[in-house]
């Protein structure tokens, strides 16, 4: 393998069942379009993308056309990909297990404003407050980052 390598040891279990795979290469600063759609675009950043994928599948089963984009990088943002999202849908939901203030969702809102995006954007992430101790699932529920809360936020956007 040529180039830098990162080994990550997250808390808890991973989501990849078959992990003995060749290493994947990611183009620096490029997002990955996991699913195309036009009613709503869900932009996820980080491991919360697994929950986002489940929500997308659930909404697709209900007949909604939902795109899912894995941003991969918070910086630099893939502005070309985001401009394509702005052109293809009027509803965007950003999801990250990071701070709302100054996070990926904020950067997307800033770009949307610069691009005169007229659609609706809802950001989900960690509030700028003390989060009580608890299990990761309890903390996600508290912050509205559990799968059901993400689904409800997406559904509200779709029906507005």
Task: Walk through the language-model features, giving the residues of each.
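Thiamine diphosphate
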Residues: 1-160
């Amino acid at each position: 393998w040529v180039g830098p390598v990162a080994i990550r040891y997250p808390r808890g279990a991973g989501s990849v069942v078959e992990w003995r795979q060749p290493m994947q290469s990611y183009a620096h600063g490029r997002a990955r379009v996991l699913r195309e759609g036009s009613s709503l675009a869900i932009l996820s950043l980080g491991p919360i993308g697994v929950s986002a994928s489940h929500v997308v599948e659930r909404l697709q089963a209900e007949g909604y056309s939902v795109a899912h984009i894995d941003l991969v990088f918070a910086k630099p943002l893939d502005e070309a990909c985001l401009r394509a999202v702005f052109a293809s849908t009027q509803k965007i939901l950003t999801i990250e297990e990071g701070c709302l203030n100054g996070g990926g969702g904020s950067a997307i809102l800033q770009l949307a404003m610069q691009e005169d995006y007229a659609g609706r954007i809802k950001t989900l992430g960690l509030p700028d407050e003390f989060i009580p101790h608890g299990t990761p699932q309890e903390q996600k529920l508290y912050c509205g980052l559990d799968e059901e809360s993400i689904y409800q936020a997406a559904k509200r956007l779709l029906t507005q």
